[in-house]
């Protein structure tokens, strides 16, 4: 399979290193790839958040290894109403070079709704967390964004 071929390619490169420790990396290519996964809030499917990362890959032909994570973040999914996303945690785990990376993030949505007074407007799956004369602020429960990116699925 592709994963085994990739491992064999990189093992061959390591074994063919010159005695002075310089490997023949001239034909290897660095590549940056954006990966992401979108999660829907279980209590209200109108709201979605995305975990996104930019990976640094190095390889040859169609065989690459992940050398590192250049950046990662969680954010609200484009088109998710007028809500805001509050990121609480964002991290990743892998022993580089690697063929996969584990991502872990969490956060919650907030949304303000204006009303004409005398009552509030409910949002399914949200709790009222603040109120002024004509504006109520709602927050969702904390949402976990946990996933694994595999270079060769």
Regions found by a protein language model. Give the residues of each.
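Intrinsically disordered, low-complexity regions of eukaryotic proteins
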Residues: 29-32, 54, 104, 138, ...
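Short, low-complexity, Pro/Ser/Thr/Gly-rich segments in the mature regions of secreted, periplasmic
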Residues: 137-153
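Generic "edge-of-domain/loop-turn" microfeature
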Residues: 46, 62, 110-116, 152
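Glycine- and small hydrophobic-rich membrane-insertion segments that are intrinsically disordered
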Residues: 111-136
């Amino acid at each position: 399979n592709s994963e085994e071929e990739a491992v064999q390619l990189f093992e061959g490169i390591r074994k063919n290193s010159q005695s002075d420790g310089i490997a023949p990396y001239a034909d290897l290519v660095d590549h940056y790839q954006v990966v992401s996964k979108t999660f829907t809030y279980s209590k209200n499917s109108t709201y979605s958040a995305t975990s996104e990362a930019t990976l640094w890959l190095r390889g040859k032909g169609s065989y690459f290894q992940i050398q590192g994570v250049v950046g990662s973040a969680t954010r609200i999914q484009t088109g998710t109403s007028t809500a805001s996303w509050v990121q609480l945690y964002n991290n990743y785990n892998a022993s580089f070079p690697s063929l996969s990376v584990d991502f872990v993030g969490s956060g919650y949505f907030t949304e303000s709704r204006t009303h004409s007074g005398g009552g509030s407007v409910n949002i399914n799956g949200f709790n009222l967390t603040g109120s002024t004369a004509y504006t109520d602020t709602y927050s969702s429960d904390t949402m976990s964004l946990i996933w694994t990116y595999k270079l060769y699925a």
